[in-house]
Curated annotation (Swiss-Prot):
Expressed by the venom gland. GO terms for cellular component: extracellular region. SMART domains: SVWC (SM01318). Residues 1-24 form the signal peptide. It comes from Ethmostigmus rubripes. GO terms for molecular function: toxin activity. This is U-scoloptoxin(16)-Er10a.
Length: 108
C-alpha cells in the first residue's frame, strides 16, 4: 500500500510539474520608441505586435503599445524546482519555448 501511495504522490507531482512547465516567465517593460516602433532589448526597431526571438537566452519578445506608451513583453523559461527522483534535461529545439529545459521523473 505504501508503494502505491508513493506512486500516486509522485504521479500527482509530475502532473503539476508539467502544468507548471507550460507557463512562461513573462515580464513587461516600458521601452523607448522611435518612428512608431519599440526599441527592443536588442537595440533594433520593432513594430507593434511584432514578435522576435533571442536564441542566445531562449526568449520571445513582443512589441506592444497603448495610450501610455510602448512596451516590450519578454517571455523566458521559468526556473523549475524538482524532487530528487527527477532530473532536468535540455530543451529539444533551438527557439523559445522548445529550448527551455524540462524535468523528467523515473517511476519505480
Amino acid at each position: 500500500m505504501a508503494s502505491f501511495t508513493s506512486f500516486c504522490v509522485l504521479f500527482t507531482f509530475c502532473l503539476l510539474l508539467l502544468a507548471h512547465q507550460a507557463r512562461s516567465g513573462e515580464r513587461q517593460y516600458k521601452t523607448e520608441s522611435r518612428n512608431g516602433k519599440c526599441v527592443g532589448e536588442d537595440d533594433q526597431l520593432h513594430a507593434p505586435t511584432e514578435v522576435w526571438y533571442n536564441d542566445n537566452d531562449c526568449s520571445e519578445h513582443t512589441c506592444v503599445n497603448d495610450d501610455t506608451g510602448y512596451y516590450e513583453i519578454i517571455r523566458r523559461c521559468t526556473l523549475i524546482a524538482y524532487p530528487d527522483e527527477c532530473h532536468m534535461i535540455n530543451g529539444t529545439g533551438p527557439r523559445y519555448p522548445q529550448c527551455c529545459c524540462k524535468v523528467t521523473c523515473e517511476l519505480d
